[in-house]
Amino acid sequence: MLLTLSPAEILHTYQTLEKIFPKPIFPKQFQKVHTLGDISHLYDAFFFDAFGVLNLGETAIPLAAERIKTLRQQNKQLCIVSNAASVSRQQLFEKYTKLGFDFSLDEIVSSRDALATYLHTHSAENYGVTAPIGTKLNDLNGSFINLIEYPDAMDTVDGILLLSSQDWTSSLQETLIQSLITKPRPILLGNPDLVAPRDNGFSLEPGFMAKQILDKAHIKALAFGKPYDNIFNLAKAKLKPNTALSRTLMIGDTLHTDILGGCNAGLHTAMVSANGFASTIPWQDTIQKTGICPHYVIDFI
């Protein structure tokens, strides 16, 4: 979906969701440092948000790949923790390899992985899915109908999977909302992000679609990904035995997903302020108003 909101409006929307987000204990104040290199000696493991930290859209952020290589040379544990739901882990691996990063397949955890884990024991049968036509869903347990390809199926499916906003239109969104008002059904949310930073701005993401449905149809989606435990539990399971959570750092550009979720998972957190969503808002005022405080604010990794 095309962006029609200003950064201030996006921030306000995140703030209206605070009542349904986890409520961890945050640091009382943050420490401002220039780059991740200034504090990397304090940590054994690093969890990286992708969009806004490693890349903007299809472009790698300058020097990000070099930082990853440096941390690897220091024998640090590394993992991407991303709210990417529309592609498989293999596709994410191929994307970041192409962008110049040397993450292994096992060093990537996505909200789709958290969703797939849930569906192992809760099959989604006859679910309508929001995703580009041709999206592969082989890793997800259930039967799915693509609502872009078959919009008339909205009234007949038994549930909705909000997987991607790509190719989803405002008209389709309104039709879906009206269908859910008439016939309420369960909703699975594969990506809680409201927006994603791109090369030339932001795109509206499935989290925004879920917020509209919550407001108008009064159906709360079951969400997978940051800031929720389901994705962090998968990432923490990859840590070496005896790795202290207090020596594990979550790095992201969004207070309400990366920082809130990282703190809720018992990790230390660092917000990137020169790239991504944080660079578009008065982040110091936002930290003060929301109380969502990272351990560090860094310019970039």
Show where each model-derived region lies:
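Short glycine-rich or small-residue beta-strand-to-loop segments that form or flank ligand, phosphate
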Residues: 77-81
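Conserved nucleotide-binding/hydrolysis micro-motifs of P-loop NTPases
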Residues: 87
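Conserved phosphate/oxyanion-binding catalytic-loop motifs
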Residues: 84
